[in-house]
Design a protein with these regions (language model features):
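Small/polar, glycine/serine/threonine/aspartate-rich low-complexity segments that form flexible
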Residues: 17-18, 64-97, 224-234, 267, ...
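Short segments within alpha-helical structural elements
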Residues: 41, 55, 191-213, 369-427
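N-terminal signal peptide c-region/cleavage motif recognized by signal peptidases
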Residues: 10-12
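Periplasmic alpha-helical coiled-coil/stalk elements that build and connect Gram-negative outer-membrane
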Residues: 123, 129-244, 354, 358, ...
């Protein structure tokens, strides 16, 4: 996973006024997300297929009922010919069951069980992707809210400075150009504030859309203690995180199931070399209109029972080809599993590296901000006393604004990187 925490896709919610926690947003999204719901449908279909594979062990029973009508030419005592009709009713009941087919039926059940497990892991993977998107969008809203607060504070401070500059201009203590510099700065910061407010609205809409929740202006989220989250770094290296991920990540489980299914498919193919043994049973009867029906049914009753063996002598190399394809299927599945493991390892390594880099960047941003705030405080005092012109003062203010922005970005990038580590370790995403 990359640390591009500011990118995401989104989903909608409900119109009740409440404060939504990250857990609330995730739970709602998992209930409403179309892909998750489609995964549920696939699971239901898979369950039907599994049950059918199990039911194939039992005998099949069929019944038939037929009515035959015929005519024949007859000559009476006067030598005249005519056609006489007759009818016959036949009924039969038959059943057959495969007693042995090279263990193919049992292996087909095992394969259906593997397929069902694969669908379960596929659903889990879909849910994890939705959860990750929601978490990313949620953090984006928190980031946008802080950006609005910072922009508003900056504009308020500049508004006070403009009032002070106006007083000093009236006293002739500063030039009109200095006053206009501060006024221009305020206008710029008000534009920045407007943009920040718009970005917050967009971030909220994005989150609601990801949740499949109708857009609601009253939608509000809970604000966790971000500082406490980043105060405790996850004590994990790439190797340990990878080992934990191997045990919990659904894509790994799915790849393992696919390999096992391919191995079972080989067993099914080998079963084609074995003879198959079937048991057949049936009974039939019939009657015509020429005699009483009850006696005919009794006298015409004909039960049957038989065993049949089918021995594959030569089938145009179909069994040989099936076995060969199954072996290659195992090789392909094993390579897919290896590729999935390697991909997971690379993602974990990148996530751990991102977390380490984010930690270093955050510390640097904190140091930059602390130095900038000290410099700004000194510059502000000088500006109020008239010992610094507006140009030099606004330079320090711009530096502080930049430091605040860098710190805010570094903080949320660090939070995201920590949560990604939790994600790979199988720890539920929450604040």
């Amino acid at each position: 996973m990359s640390a591009a925490w500011f990118t995401m896709s989104v989903l909608p919610l409900s119109s009740q006024e409440k404060v939504w926690t990250l857990t609330d947003c995730i739970d709602y999204a998992l209930n409403e997300n179309i892909q998750v719901r489609k995964a549920d449908v696939s699971l239901s279909v898979g369950e039907i297929s599994l049950q059918q594979a199990r039911d194939n062990r039992w005998p099949g029973v069929s019944a038939s009922l037929g009515e035959n009508i015929g005519w024949q030419q007859v000559t009476d005592t006067y030598g005249e010919t005519s056609f006489e009709g007759s009818s016959r009713t036949n009924a039969s009941l038959s059943s057959s069951v495969t007693l042995f087919s090279g263990f193919q039926t049992q292996n087909e059940i095992r394969q259906a069980e593997m397929s069902y497990k694969g669908l379960q892991y596929s659903k889990t993977e879909t849910e994890e992707n939705v959860t990750l998107n929601i978490m990313s969008a949620y953090l984006q809203v928190l980031y946008a809210e802080e950006q609005v607060a910072n922009s508003r504070n900056q504009a308020d401070a500049t508004r006070e400075e403009l009032a002070l500059a106006g007083e000093r201009l009236g006293l002739g203590a500063i030039a009109n150009s200095d006053y206009l510099q501060v006024k221009t700065q305020l206008a710029s910061e008000e534009v920045t504030l407007t943009n920040a407010i718009n970005n917050l609205k967009i971030a909220k809409v994005t989150l609601m859309q990801l949740m499949e929740y109708p857009v609601d202006e009253s939608f509000d989220i809970a604000r966790p203690d971000i500082d406490s989250i980043i105060s405790v770094a996850p004590a994990a290296d790439a190797v340990s995180v990878y080992q934990e991920a191997l045990q919990v990540k659904p894509q790994i489980k799915s790849a393992e199931v696919n390999r096992e299914s391919a191995e079972i498919n080989l067993d099914i193919a080998k079963g084609g070399y074995f003879p198959s043994l079937s048991l057949n049973a049936g009974m039939s009867t019939g009657f015509t209109e020429a005699a009483e029906m009850g006696s005919q049914l009794k006298s015409g009753f004909s039960p049957s029972l038989g065993l049949s063996v089918s021995i594959p002598v030569f089938r145009n190399n179909q069994n040989k080809s099936s076995v060969a394809r199954a072996r290659y299927g195992i090789t392909t599945a094993a390579l897919d599993e290896l590729n999935t493991r390697n991909q997971l390892r690379k993602e974990v390594e990148q996530a751990v590296l991102d977390a380490q880099s984010a930690g270093i960047s955050y510390e640097a941003a904190v140091n930059q901000y602390e130095a900038s705030i000290e410099t700004y405080n000194v510059a502000e005092e000088k500006f109020k006393l008239g010992a610094m012109n507006s140009v030099d003062f606004l330079i320090q203010k711009t530096n502080l604004t930049s430091a605040e922005s860098n710190l805010l970005q570094a903080k949320y990038k660090l939070v995201y990187s920590y949560k990604i580590i939790d994600f790979y370790r199988g720890i539920p995403l929450s604040f």
